[in-house]
């Protein structure tokens, strides 16, 4: 089987897929000064899958950012032309993920440039951001793949083809399909290699607004404690490891070796995060978390009061947001426990403060007062505090994902198929109810919500750190 035959079919899919849904890059700034330019005059032979990611487009509301998009200029036919990833745009571009099967070996940067008509500097930026992945063998296509895509996948992964590739000898197909990040522009990719290119990585403009040195709580030989700002990622995303707390804190401290992530808090959450200075301490801290030697306290600003005491739910074991929780035990679902230690009435944040932190209005009916709760997190599930409080009818202020569902359940008790007033009678009714309930949730917050990791301690308090006052207190008298 010749790789070219697969290429033709996949290029056809590309032209009928992505380019029919979104603007192609039909022309771009000539890079005559680049030594790589000669490579892009050749006809592309690459096999190309293309898709638009189903993830939601998230826009930043930070008005102070330079409004420069990733696609900064426009050609005569209205299509965008790519330039550089910096300066950071104030808005994320439309999702675009490209899937390639390499037909001719060579440096990865050159191959992506000629296959996708992208400028070398832009592709180099993507690689630096961690937005390009490879696998020795093309992974299994998703259920949504077309018959033509399935056919081509079978062609390039046929045993007769794979048996001729020395790079995968001794590996199972599953092992060879594992994806790894491309780390260098000159990295060689052989024919048959699969590439995934996140052309529009998720951006974090807030990283460029923060005085990172002022957010450092402690520096030791083994770790750094950071007061993470809301609207930032602790260790980066699958398509952007550059715009992260670990990267910017490392630079602020002048470290030559980047800090390492030991645990996560949501992008929209602020507060204490421990970053390891060495791989050894990263492993040590992970062990402390597993052994439950790390204690985390949160401050949550809720729209309704929360009862003092331990709250227990069970979280659906599906790694997709929003996270659904049940009051009743369900086999296979994850136990979620938190302890509400305090709950006091406070003023609802004033409009100026809300605007400063891009707090989204999810139309909670009463905004006269809010409630500040101190919470001891007893289990550490993704979105746990947000999901549990919303399930109690006390969503977090600004939580545009979970508050709409809480409002819907409050207005029409029984919509939540896992709540007190569930109404379904059969399993088929339940499936339909779950689907409808899932649709009641909103989008992920753009910057901040009323949630702070206010304290972190371990080894029975031998190491104890506190964050600064949460954002919502800055407007209080």
Where are these regions (language model features)?
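Amphipathic alpha-helical scaffolds
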Residues: 140-143
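A generic structural signal for ordered alpha-helices
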Residues: 90, 101, 167-173, 194, ...
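N-terminal chloroplast transit peptides
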Residues: 1-41
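RNA pseudouridine synthases
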Residues: 49, 54-63, 131, 184-195, ...
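Pseudouridine synthases involved in rRNA/tRNA modification
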Residues: 2-7, 37-42, 46-127, 136, ...
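Eukaryotic helix-linker segments that join adjacent hydrophobic helices
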Residues: 126-137, 147-204, 208-211, 232
């Amino acid at each position: 089987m010749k790789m070219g035959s697969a290429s033709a079919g996949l290029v056809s899919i590309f032209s009928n897929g992505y380019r029919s849904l979104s603007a192609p890059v039909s022309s771009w700034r000539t890079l005559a000064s680049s030594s790589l330019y000669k490579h892009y005059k050749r006809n592309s032979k690459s096999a190309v899958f293309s898709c638009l990611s189903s993830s939601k487009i998230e826009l930043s509301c930070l008005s102070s950012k330079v409004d420069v998009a990733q696609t900064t200029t426009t050609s005569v036919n209205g299509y965008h032309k790519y330039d550089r990833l910096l300066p950071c745009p104030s808005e994320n571009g439309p999702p675009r993920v490209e899937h390639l099967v390499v037909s001719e070996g060579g440096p990865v940067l050159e191959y992506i440039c000629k296959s996708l008509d992208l400028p070398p500097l832009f592709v180099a930026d993507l690689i630096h951001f961690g937005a390009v992945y490879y696998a020795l063998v093309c992974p299994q296509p998703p259920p949504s793949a077309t018959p033509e895509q399935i056919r081509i996948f079978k062609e390039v992964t046929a045993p007769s083809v794979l048996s001729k590739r020395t790079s995968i000898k001794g590996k199972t197909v599953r092992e060879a399909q594992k994806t790894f990040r491309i780390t260098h522009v000159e990295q060689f990719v052989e024919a048959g290699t699969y590439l995934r290119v996140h052309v529009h990585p998720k951006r974090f403009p807030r990283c460029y607004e923060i005085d990172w040195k002022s957010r450092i709580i402690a520096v030791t030989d083994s770790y750094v404690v950071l007061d993470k700002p809301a609207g930032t990622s602790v260790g980066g995303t699958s398509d952007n490891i550059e715009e992260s707390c670990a990267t910017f804190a490392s630079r602020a401290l002048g470290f030559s070796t980047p800090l390492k992530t030991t645990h996560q808090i949501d992008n929209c959450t602020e507060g204490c995060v421990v970053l390891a200075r060495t791989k050894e301490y990263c492993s040590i801290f992970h062990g402390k978390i597993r052994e439950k030697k790390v204690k985390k306290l949160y401050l949550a600003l809720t729209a309704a009061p929360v009862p003092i005491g331990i709250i227990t739910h069970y979280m659906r074991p599906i790694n997709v947001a929003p996270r659904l929780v049940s009051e009743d035990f369900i086999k296979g679902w994850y136990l979620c426990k938190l302890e509400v230690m305090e709950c006091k009435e406070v003023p609802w944040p004033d409009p100026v403060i809300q605007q400063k932190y891009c707090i989204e209005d999810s139309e909670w009916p009463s905004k006269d007062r809010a409630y500040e709760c101190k919470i001891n997190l007893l289990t550490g599930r993704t979105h746990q505090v947000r999901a549990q409080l919303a399930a109690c009818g006390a969503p977090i202020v600004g939580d545009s994902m979970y508050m709409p569902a809480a409002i819907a359940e409050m207005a029409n008790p029984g919509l939540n198929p896992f709540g007190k007033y569930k109404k379904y009678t059969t399993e088929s009714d339940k499936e339909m109810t779950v689907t409808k309930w899932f649709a009641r949730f909103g989008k992920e917050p753009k910057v901040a919500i009323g949630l702070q990791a206010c304290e972190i301690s371990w080894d029975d308090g031998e190491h104890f750190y506190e964050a600064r006052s949460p954002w919502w207190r800055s407007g209080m008298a």
